[in-house]
Amino acid sequence: MTRRTPTLTISVLLLAAACSSTSTGVSAAPPSPTQTAASHTPKPTVAAPTQPDKIVVVVMENSPYDTIAGNPALHFIGGTIAPQTLTLTQMHADSAPSLPNYVWMAAGQSCGADGSDTAFDRTCPSLFDQMDRKGIGWTVYAEGYPGGAGSCFTGVSSDTASNDYARKHVPSLLFSSTSAGAACTSHVKNFPNDTSADGSAPVNNFKGVHLPALTFVIPNLCHDMHNSASQCGAAQGGQAGGDLWLSRNWASLTQDAGPHGVVILTWDEGQPGSEHIATFIGGAGTSAIGGTQDGHAYDHSSTLRAIEDALGLPCLAGACGATPLPILIPAN
């Protein structure tokens, strides 16, 4: 006799399960309109910080960090610049004396210039070469630069003592590829030092001139804290002279950088053996970080890396392993 019990049992169980489901009404209730709306409400997006469209780098001279940051004698740096900017508390120079540090800012290495202030015409690749290849605009404004009007001046210093121009502080004139011809005449200019009658009021240096993507500003030796007051006389000199120069020019520089630009104020070197230097990052678009500090370790390769990242350029030498300076524009 054929046994059908298993088939019958399975059928009975399926029928019982169906009846149980129907009779008890156990099923997921449709979500309420409130639940549906809540589950599909998009989270607000937070705008990411953006790269600046203009970068201005102002380089001062020979000042250890603790003689700049918090120095009550430097009224403008302490009273205006620091509250408006991000202060980098662990920035260090890479070499000594001055010249190799300026090379490092543009090449991520000293290119064999360590220990020399006259090792011009370096042949290693530089930021300026990168920008020229991509057609990105750049200018170096050196205060007291004797060249111009189609001429390129490559002398070590200016012919007049009162000018206090020094080639060793002009980054692009330290490389053979950008210290002659059109690369020099088109990009290196005298800083338009438009002072008031008594030399004390803030000025508008560029008078609406459209700044390129990258601008270096190099004050002369009496305005960059390099020369002492006794060397500069009426030009004041020393750290007080540099603070006064910044008080006349800072507003113009930050304004001319535009609403999405940044100004990096840094020093070439500090003190032998330490090279701890001050650096401030400001500009119209950085007001959200004004008066704050960053304690991460940075150096001149970090400056180069930040510029390369902002301009979409590949890294050079030491910049490849460097932490970029925090120059991103915070979202509003």
Predicted regions and their residues:
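Bacterial signal peptide processing site
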Residues: 20-23
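Extracellular mucin-like PTS domains
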Residues: 25-45
